[in-house]
């Protein structure tokens, strides 16, 4: 009887594991790349409009959790199944492919859940 109960609970355990995997967060830190022209405004940079459209799509898909800028670094927190998936997703951005920006991607492990207004 105990084995039957365990067998019946197994699918619930597997679903729970998948949900946890879906909840992984990663931080992407953007800096300007070799294509960036310091004599041009951001909107005048090659591939900048495409970059903005790419990030807009990720926001609409609820992939981006939040974004911020500090100094010359842009930061987004995004959801992905694993680090490799996060990197692969971000490198679909034509601005990264053409080195308008550089990006570093790291696991983002929350230790304090605050709130933003």
Q: Where are the predicted features?
A:
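Bacterial Sec-dependent N-terminal signal peptides
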Residues: 1-21
């Amino acid at each position: 009887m105990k084995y039957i109960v365990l067998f019946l609970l197994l699918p619930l355990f597997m679903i729970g594991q998948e949900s946890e995997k879906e909840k992984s967060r990663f931080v992407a830190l953007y800096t300007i790349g070799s294509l960036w022209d310091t004599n041009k405004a951001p909107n005048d940079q090659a591939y900048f409009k495409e970059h903005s459209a790419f990030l807009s799509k990720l926001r609409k898909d609820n992939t981006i959790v939040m974004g911020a800028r500090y100094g010359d670094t842009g930061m987004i927190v995004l959801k992905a199944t694993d680090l490799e998936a996060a990197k692969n997703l971000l490198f679909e951005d034509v601005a990264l492919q053409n080195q308008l920006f550089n990006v570093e991607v790291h696991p983002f492990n929350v230790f304090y859940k605050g709130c933003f207004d």
